[in-house]
Amino acid sequence: MEKVSAFIIAYNEEKLIERALKSLKGVVDEILVFHDGPCSDKTLDIAKKYTNKIGILPRKGRAALHLIAAIKKAKNDWVFKLDADEFLSEELKKNINKLAQDKEASAYTFRWPWRLNDEYITKDWPIKKAMFRKSKCSFIEYPGWDEPRTLGKTINTKYLLEHRPNKGIAYNSLSSFIEKALGRYGKSQARYTLMPFSSFETYQYDKKDFPIITRIRRKFPLVSAPLFSIVAFGKILFKHNVLREGSPVLVEAVKTSIYYLFLGYYVHVLKQGRNLEKVFPKNKLN
């Protein structure tokens, strides 16, 4: 019988992490918790009630930058990546081990609908690839590489992966978008984009360079930004059924297109040798 390892990468999540851990207890074979840098609240004390497999990793500010370390520590081939503000629905808890027995499956996606306070505002969108085989996945330790690229069959399930942040808003509000996406995340990704490929840790990645989109953005940041922005806008609208899910999909398409415009300009600014924090001060975009 194939078993499942689940891991959480957290940063001072004492208000949320116990709910996530409770949903895993008695369901998966192994629970691992990793903290992004030193912990200043009770996150790790809470985690110790559920597992002794706890690690404190160097502070990097993005969970994606710790995924390879977490995957390597998991003992089972099947891994489940859970955020501290997520938890398994009852239906998913009952079926997760059954999913692991499918020999043809390499990964599973789950419904991850947006919520506003206590109500869902989408039904079947977005979806999240949270469960996958270590032997079939590949990663680059790169901001934004939050989901694995997997070989083989990915099965889109109807099971619900609950996402309920402490603020009660399970999607990027405008203020969050400006602060995180256009601020910290956008600037971070721009800096990483210009780093040499050899400086990145990889996991089962069979190429000798970044994906083509990243290479184009590195070389032609300003020219490519509008193109990537338009493509992302159209892809989200048509791939994620805007007619069924409504305005949240449209809003996400607009935000993503804006993000790609800013990202291209951030890369351009850095290539000129200018300081991003002077061009875009923290009190404006971060």
Q: How should each PLM-predicted stretch be described?
A:
Residues 3-5:
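Cell-envelope/extracellular polymer assembly enzymes that use nucleotide-activated donors
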Residues 29, 44-73:
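Conserved donor nucleotide-binding strand/loop of the catalytic core
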